[in-house]
Amino acid sequence: MLKQRTIKSIVKTVGIGLHSGRKVELTLRPAAPDTGIVFSRVDLPTPVDIPASALSIGDTRLASVLQKDGARVSTVEHLMSACAGLGIDNLYVDVTAEEIPIMDGSAASFVFLIQSAGIEEQNAAKKFIKVTKPVEIRDGDKFARLDPYFGFKLKFTIDFRHPAVDKTGQELEVDFANTSYVREIARARTFGFAHEVEMMRELGLARGGSMDNAIVLDEYRILNNDGLRYDDEFVKHKMLDAIGDLYVVGHPLLASYTAYKSGHGLNNALLRELLAHEDAYEIVTFDDPKAAPTGFGFDAQTAFA
């Protein structure tokens, strides 16, 4: 059977929170089958466990924020994206602040951390959410949509009307049957505009933001001396975010995702719309790994590619 996965050993790292600017300690621990991805605020007097779930996402203005009993864990999308890309089903994430550290602004540090811990299969069938009917959410000209598809592919279009962004790819389509997440998506960094960063800092946000963890643009150009990691890094990062946003549903999706100018809020609304229609999806497993869609096999996802 196609099996669930966790990590082999405990790994730790330290980084800063993008918005708080404070030091955050992050510990990843193995978890038993059917645990899911569980975030734990270990800095609180009584630690609070917050399982990743579409219905636990609260604030989505600047990041995806998990909330439970007054406790929050913000900016979960890059770590969730890495878990999705490597096929991690079960994991405990201990964090000492209300923010996952931003690291270099991409998912690459989390991929490295998980690969350093080692990935192991568990004696339980991996569960997928198979989309059986189209589901769509619109907000003005923005939209996000899921269609039935035997695999996982995404098509994302951005439109920032900025000269530096316009010169790069505005549209990207990826099918993980023939694309390596680690090689093609994981290193794409978050990006922001200098004037917005100043405004956010005045509001007490983005205190940890810098060119070490984001692509920063002025009105005309990219300010980072080292330029871009991918020719189409902007749209690739939006896809990285979407992969993480969608993975909070609890299982990998078997679906085709199409989006235009979507963000954390629209992605979460799409998941809620899916879950509200029980006839639009089903939970499936694969007794024979060869019967599963290409790209979800252990070797395909966990290779050091």
Curated annotation (Swiss-Prot):
It comes from the Bacteria. It is an enzyme of class 3 (hydrolase). Zn(2+) binds at residues 78, 237, 241. GO terms for cellular component: membrane. The lineage of its organism: Bacteria, Pseudomonadati, Pseudomonadota, Betaproteobacteria, Burkholderiales. Pathway: Glycolipid biosynthesis; lipid IV(A) biosynthesis; lipid IV(A) from (3R)-3-hydroxytetradecanoyl-[acyl-carrier-protein] and UDP-N-acetyl-alpha-D-glucosamine: step 2/6. Its cofactor is Zn(2+). Catalyzes the hydrolysis of UDP-3-O-myristoyl-N-acetylglucosamine to form UDP-3-O-myristoylglucosamine and acetate, the committed step in lipid A biosynthesis. The keyword RNA-binding does not apply. It comes from Burkholderia thailandensis (strain ATCC 700388 / DSM 13276 / CCUG 48851 / CIP 106301 / E264). This is UDP-3-O-acyl-N-acetylglucosamine deacetylase. One of its GO terms (biological process) is lipid A biosynthetic process. The gene is lpxC. Belongs to the LpxC family. It catalyses: a UDP-3-O-[(3R)-3-hydroxyacyl]-N-acetyl-alpha-D-glucosamine + H2O = a UDP-3-O-[(3R)-3-hydroxyacyl]-alpha-D-glucosamine + acetate. HAMAP family: LpxC. Its EC number is 3.5.1.108. Pfam families: LpxC. Keywords: Hydrolase, Lipid A biosynthesis, Lipid biosynthesis, Lipid metabolism, Metal-binding, Zinc. The active site is at residue 264. One of its GO terms (molecular function) is metal ion binding. InterPro entries: Ribosomal_Su5_D2-typ_SF, UDP-acyl_GlcNac_deAcase, UDP-acyl_GlcNac_deAcase_C, UDP-acyl_N-AcGlcN_deAcase_N.
